[in-house]
Curated annotation (Swiss-Prot):
<dbReference type="InterPro" id="IPR017911">
    <property type="entry name" value="MacB-like_ATP-bd"/>
</dbReference>
<comment type="similarity">
    <text>Belongs to the ABC transporter superfamily. Macrolide exporter (TC 3.A.1.122) family.</text>
</comment>
<dbReference type="InterPro" id="IPR003439">
    <property type="entry name" value="ABC_transporter-like_ATP-bd"/>
</dbReference>
<dbReference type="Pfam" id="PF02687">
    <property type="entry name" value="FtsX"/>
</dbReference>
<feature type="transmembrane region" description="Helical">
    <location>
        <begin position="273"/>
        <end position="293"/>
    </location>
</feature>
<keyword id="KW-0997">Cell inner membrane</keyword>
<keyword id="KW-0812">Transmembrane</keyword>
<dbReference type="GO" id="GO:0046677">
    <property type="term" value="P:response to antibiotic"/>
</dbReference>
<dbReference type="GO" id="GO:0016887">
    <property type="term" value="F:ATP hydrolysis activity"/>
</dbReference>
<dbReference type="InterPro" id="IPR003838">
    <property type="entry name" value="ABC3_permease_C"/>
</dbReference>
<dbReference type="InterPro" id="IPR025857">
    <property type="entry name" value="MacB_PCD"/>
</dbReference>
<protein>
    <recommendedName>
        <fullName>Macrolide export ATP-binding/permease protein MacB</fullName>
        <ecNumber>7.6.2.-</ecNumber>
    </recommendedName>
</protein>
<keyword id="KW-0472">Membrane</keyword>
<feature type="domain" description="ABC transporter">
    <location>
        <begin position="5"/>
        <end position="243"/>
    </location>
</feature>
<dbReference type="InterPro" id="IPR017871">
    <property type="entry name" value="ABC_transporter-like_CS"/>
</dbReference>
<keyword id="KW-0547">Nucleotide-binding</keyword>
<dbReference type="InterPro" id="IPR003593">
    <property type="entry name" value="AAA+_ATPase"/>
</dbReference>
Length: 648
C-alpha cells in the first residue's frame, strides 16, 4: 500500500542563541490514504511541529517529506500554498475563525484563494454547513456561535476545497464533553468517507478513537504501529481547482481582495475613519489649493486683462521720469497714422493730458483731462454706462465734447438719472457730456484722481496748444505675439525718427509676470498641502503596521488555508489603497464644500473643478496608498505561517 504522506529521517531544529535546539529527531513515518491517526505526546514533545510539517506549514531541517510521492523540499512557497489549499484542511483548537466574517464567509476563505466563482463557493459553503447541522447559523458571526458550533464551522472550512487530509490540532481541547463528542463523531464520519484524518492530542480518550496511535516523546517516535488496511468509501471530494482563464482569475482575485479589504475596514470603523483623516485633510488641501489657486490666478489675470492686455504704450524719452526737453516732442500725429496702418494693429490711440477744473452749477472739482481718440476705449476694453465715445467727425472738428468716468459723474451729478447732453465747463471752455465710461482698475490700485476724456484734437489745440503727443497706446490684434509687435513698433518709429528717442511698455510683460508670480505662489502652497498629504500617508502606514501586528494570527490562518504570500501582499496593499481612495473621495467632497462656501462669501470668484484636478486627486490617493501601504503589506506577506498562528 503506497503511503499518502511519508517522512524519511526528518529532523527539525530551531536556533536558540548560538545553539540549535532539536525539536524533531530522525522521524520516519508513513500515513496512508483513509487512515485515522492520532499523534500523542506530552507538551513540548514535538507533536505540533510534526503536524506543521505534515501540513506544509513548516519545512524539515533535514530528511525528506513526500506528499503523494512529491518531495516537498522541491516546491517553492506558491506551490506549497497550492498544496495546502488543494489537499489539506486544518482544524484548530481555538477554531481560528475571522471575527469580522460570518460563518459562511469563514468557510469560503479557502475557495477564495482557489479562485472559485462566488456563487459556486457560496453554494458549497452552505451545503457544508447544512451537512454539519449549522443551516440556521450560516450568516452568524463567530461571536454569536457556541464553541462546538465554531469548531464545526472550522471543519466545514477544512472541507471547502476537498480536504483530502484533515489535520486536527486538539480539536476538542476548548470544548465541553458533549461538543467534543459531536466533533469526534464528525471526524469519524469523514474517515469513513475516505478522508485521511490526523489528530494531534494529549487526551488518551480522544486518541483511543483513532485506528492508529503514534506516540512521540522528546522529538522521537516511540510507538508507531503498522497501518491497518481497510476498505473505505471513496467519498472524498476532489480538490477544487479554478479552470478559468488567467485574466479572469486575476480579476476575480482582485475583486475578492477588494471585498475582504472593505470588510476589514468596516470591522474597525473608528480606526479606519481616524486613519483616513490625514488623507482627507491632505487631499482636501491639495485640491482646494489647486482649484481655488487657479480661480484666484484667473481673477488676477482677468483684472490685468481688464486694464488692457495686448497693449503697448509708447512714451517719449529713454525711460519713465526722463524729462529731457529734446525728447518731449518726439511723438507726432504722423507717427500715430503710420502705426494705425500696420496689419497687426487692432487700434491705436494718442494721449495728451492736463489737470483741469471741471464745473457744473456750483460744483467745482479737479480732474485729470485726457485727450484721446475714439479708439481709446476699445484699446483698453472699456464699456459705457451712458452714451458713447466721440466719432471721427467730432475728432476732426475739435468738438467740445467730453466723456466722464463714473466717479466724476457721481461728483457732478449726484441726483441726475441721465447726464448725456449736459453742459459743463472744462477750464473756461464749455463741453457737452456725450458718455459715461465704466470704472477700470489701475495696475496699482484705484486712483483718487477723477478722469475725463476729450478728443485729442480738442485737447491739443483748444486747451493745451501743443502739436505733439504725450504717449501712444497700441492694441495688438489677437493671435499676434506682443513681443514681436513691440520689436516692429520700435523698428518703425526708429526709422521714422532716425533715432530711438522713445521707449515702450508692454502690458503683456505685466501679465506674464503676474502669471509667473501666481504660479510660484500656487506651487509653494501646493507643496505645503503635499506635506500634509505625506503626513497623512505616514499615518496610514503607521496604522497599517499596527494592523499587521494585530492581525498576525489572521494572516497565519489565511496562509494555512492556502493563501500565497502574494495574496496577503495584495490584500493589505489594497486595504491601504482603499483607505486612501475613500479618504481621497471624502477629501474631494470637503474641498467642494470649501469651494461652495468661498463662492458664497466671494461671489466674484469662479471656482470650478476640472477633470484634471479630480484625476490628480485620484492618482494622489492611489499613489499614497501604494507608497505608504507597501511596507506593511510586505511585512504581512513575509510572515511565517507557523509563527503567525502561534501569536496571541
Amino acid at each position: 500500500m503506497t503511503a499518502l504522506l511519508e517522512l524519511c529521517n526528518v529532523s527539525r531544529s530551531y536556533p536558540s542563541g548560538e545553539e540549535q535546539v532539536a525539536v524533531l529527531k530522525d522521524i520516519s513515518l508513513q500515513i496512508h490514504a483513509g487512515e485515522m491517526v492520532a499523534i500523542v505526546g506530552v507538551s513540548g514533545s514535538g507533536k505540533s511541529t510534526l503536524m506543521n510539517i505534515l501540513g506544509c506549514l513548516d519545512k524539515p531541517t533535514s530528511g525528506t517529506y513526500r506528499v503523494a510521492g512529491r518531495d516537498v523540499s522541491t516546491l517553492d512557497p506558491d506551490a506549497l500554498a497550492q498544496l495546502r489549499r488543494e489537499h489539506f484542511g486544518f482544524i484548530f483548537q481555538r477554531y481560528h475563525l475571522l471575527s469580522h466574517l460570518t460563518a459562511a464567509q469563514n468557510v469560503e476563505i479557502p475557495a477564495v484563494y482557489a479562485g472559485i466563482e462566488r456563487k459556486k463557493r457560496q453554494t458549497r459553503a452552505r451545503e457544508l454547513l447544512l451537512r454539519l447541522g449549522l443551516s440556521d447559523r450560516v450568516d452568524y458571526p463567530p461571536s454569536q456561535l457556541s464553541g462546538g458550533q465554531q469548531q464545526r464551522v472550522s471543519i466545514a472550512r477544512a472541507l471547502m476545497n476537498g480536504g483530502q487530509v484533515i489535520l486536527a490540532d486538539e480539536p476538542t481541547g476548548a470544548l465541553d464533553s458533549h461538543s467534543g463528542e459531536e466533533v469526534m463523531a464528525i471526524l469519524r464520519q469523514l474517515r469513513d468517507r475516505g478522508h485521511t484524518v490526523i489528530i494531534v492530542t494529549h487526551d488518551p480518550l480522544i486518541a483511543a478513537q483513532a485506528e492508529r496511535i503514534i506516540e512521540i516523546h522528546d522529538g522521537k517516535i516511540v510507538h508507531n504501529p503498522p497501518a491497518q488496511e481497510k476498505k473505505r468509501e471513496q467519498g472524498v471530494d476532489a480538490a477544487v481547482v479554478n479552470t478559468a482563464p488567467g485574466w479572469r482569475q486575476f480579476a476575480s482575485s482582485f475583486r475578492e481582495a477588494l471585498s475582504m479589504a472593505w470588510l476589514a475596514m468596516a470591522a474597525n470603523k473608528m480606526r479606519t475613519l481616524l486613519t483616513m483623516l490625514g488623507i482627507i485633510i491632505g487631499i482636501a488641501s491639495v485640491v482646494s489649493i489647486v482649484v481655488v489657486g487657479d480661480a484666484a490666478k484667473q481673477m488676477v489675470l482677468a483684472d490685468i486683462r481688464a486694464m488692457g492686455t495686448n497693449t503697448i504704450d509708447i512714451h517719449p524719452g529713454k525711460d519713465f521720469g526722463d524729462d529731457n526737453p529734446q525728447y518731449r516732442q518726439a511723438l507726432k500725429y504722423d507717427d500715430l497714422v503710420a502705426i494705425q496702418k500696420q496689419p497687426w494693429v487692432n487700434s491705436a490711440t494718442p494721449s495728451v493730458s492736463k489737470s483741469l477744473r471741471l464745473r457744473y452749477g456750483n460744483i467745482d472739482i479737479a480732474v485729470n483731462a485726457n485727450g484721446v481718440s475714439g479708439d481709446y476705449f476699445n484699446v483698453y476694453g472699456m464699456s459705457f454706462r451712458e452714451g458713447n465715445t466721440f466719432n471721427a467727425v467730432q475728432q476732426q472738428d475739435r468738438a467740445q465734447v467730453v466723456v466722464l468716468d463714473a466717479n466724476t459723474r457721481r461728483q457732478l451729478f449726484p441726483n441726475k438719472a441721465n447726464v448725456v447732453g449736459e453742459v459743463v465747463l472744462a477750464g473756461n471752455m464749455p463741453v457737452i457730456v456725450i458718455g459715461v465710461a465704466e470704472e477700470k482698475p489701475s495696475m496699482y490700485g484705484n486712483s483718487n484722481l477723477l478722469q475725463v476724456w476729450l478728443p485729442y484734437s480738442t485737447m491739443s489745440d483748444r486747451i493745451m496748444g501743443q502739436s505733439w503727443l504725450n504717449s501712444i497706446t497700441v492694441r495688438v490684434k489677437d493671435g499676434v505675439d506682443s513681443d514681436q509687435a513691440e520689436q516692429q513698433l520700435t523698428r518703425l518709429l526708429t526709422l521714422r525718427h532716425g533715432k530711438k528717442d522713445f521707449f515702450t511698455w508692454n502690458m503683456d510683460s505685466v501679465l506674464k509676470t503676474a502669471e509667473k508670480t501666481t504660479y510660484t505662489l500656487q506651487l509653494f502652497l501646493t507643496l505645503v498641502a503635499v506635506i500634509s498629504l505625506v503626513v497623512g500617508g505616514i499615518g496610514v502606514m503607521n496604522i497599517m503596521l499596527v494592523s499587521v501586528t494585530e492581525r498576525t494570527r489572521e494572516i497565519g490562518i489565511r496562509m494555512a488555508v492556502g493563501a500565497r504570500a502574494s495574496d496577503v501582499l495584495q490584500q493589505f496593499l489594497i486595504e491601504a489603497v482603499l483607505v486612501c481612495l475613500v479618504g481621497g473621495a471624502l477629501g474631494i467632497s470637503l474641498s467642494m464644500f470649501i469651494a461652495f462656501m468661498l463662492q458664497l462669501f466671494l461671489p466674484g470668484w469662479e471656482i470650478g473643478f476640472s477633470l484634471t484636478a479630480l484625476a490628480s486627486a485620484f492618482l494622489c490617493s492611489t499613489f499614497t496608498g501604494i507608497l505608504f501601504g507597501w511596507l506593511p503589506a510586505r511585512n504581512a506577506a513575509r510572515l511565517d505561517p507557523v509563527d503567525a498562528l502561534a501569536r496571541e
